[in-house]
């Protein structure tokens, strides 16, 4: 198992460095998010081809990762083609070391998030019991939620009449960041699906879903958006009303839960 972790780490670093070279040379943001989802997909199938055993159950894990990864990469690529640039990299893409640091940290994040998927793909010691089914349903809810939320926000932002407005349609009527809720659910679902194969130190792969949860809640996801919205709409009473009447993540009316 250790060799598979090492193999995964090496592949992740190689992929990230290749995309970094492209992004740095052409001074482009178009490959950044594309590389993120694709790295998960590539690593999953490499691990499957080198897995400790082959079976129906461990085939499902890379399939789950692939559906999530290709969907996310495709969406982000279409979005960056429309927006032309990613504001996150303003002042960074021109600085070689800072830009390289971002790609390195992205590689580290991918490895940590992937931990349960690596084990779940490499081992086939389970049947499709209640835990696996529950995990798959959680995953499915996550992917569907993230897909719907991304589509709704993209379409809203694509409408010129919504210029300067915050997204408040569909799932966003109930939560300000339902897409992040979907992504968190996705990775907890993958961990739960793989749970019955875990043994000993492998239970520590729970670090994967914990990491993505904390990352989105406290670092790269929610905080910068909340800060930007608060700054932009600080004097807007309608936004403050919207903020106070919605949840942060969970896309349900407050009256329900």
Show the residue positions of the predicted features.
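Short, amphipathic, aromatic/basic-enriched membrane-interface segments that mark the entry/exit
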Residues: 3-7, 24-32, 101, 173-178
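Hydrophobic transmembrane alpha-helices
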Residues: 4-16, 39-69, 113-152, 157-257
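Generic alpha-helical scaffold signal
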Residues: 12, 25-32, 54-60, 83
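C-terminal ends of transmembrane helices
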Residues: 17-28, 74-81
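Juxtamembrane helix-capping/reentrant segments at transmembrane boundaries
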Residues: 28-38, 84-102, 165-172
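Select subsegments of transmembrane alpha-helices in polytopic membrane proteins
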Residues: 32-34, 97-110, 176-183
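Active-site His/Glu-centered metal-binding helix of metallohydrolases
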Residues: 35, 73, 108, 144, ...
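A basic- and aromatic-enriched beta-loop-alpha substructure that forms the phosphate/nucleotide-
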Residues: 57-93
């Amino acid at each position: 198992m250790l060799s598979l972790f090492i193999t995964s780490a090496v592949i992740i670093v190689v992929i990230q460095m290749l995309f970094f070279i492209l992004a740095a040379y052409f001074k482009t943001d178009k490959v950044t998010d594309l590389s993120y989802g694709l790295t998960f997909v590539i690593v999953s199938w490499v691990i499957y081809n080198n897995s400790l055993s082959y079976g129906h159950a461990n085939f499902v894990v890379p399939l789950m990762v692939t559906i999530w990864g290709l969907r996310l990469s495709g969406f982000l690529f279409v979005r960056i083609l429309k927006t032309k640039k990613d504001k996150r990299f303003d002042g960074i893409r021109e600085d070689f070391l800072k830009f390289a640091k971002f790609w390195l940290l992205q590689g580290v994040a991918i490895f940590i998030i992937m931990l349960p998927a690596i084990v779940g793909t490499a081992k086939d010691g389970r049947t499709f019991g209640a835990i696996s089914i529950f995990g798959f349903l959680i995953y499915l809810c996550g992917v569907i939620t993230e897909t719907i939320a991304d589509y709704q926000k993209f379409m809203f932002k694509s409408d010129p009449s919504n210029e300067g407005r915050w997204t408040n349609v569909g799932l966003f009527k109930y939560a300000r960041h339902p897409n992040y809720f979907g992504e968190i659910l996705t990775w907890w679902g993958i961990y739960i699906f793989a749970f019955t194969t875990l043994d000993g130190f492998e239970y520590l792969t729970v670090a994967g879903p914990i990491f993505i949860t904390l990352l989105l809640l406290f670092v790269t996801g929610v905080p910068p958006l909340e800060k930007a919205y608060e700054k932009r709409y600080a004097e807007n009473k309608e936004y403050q009303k919207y903020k106070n009447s919605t949840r942060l993540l969970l896309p349900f009316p407050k009256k329900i839960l």
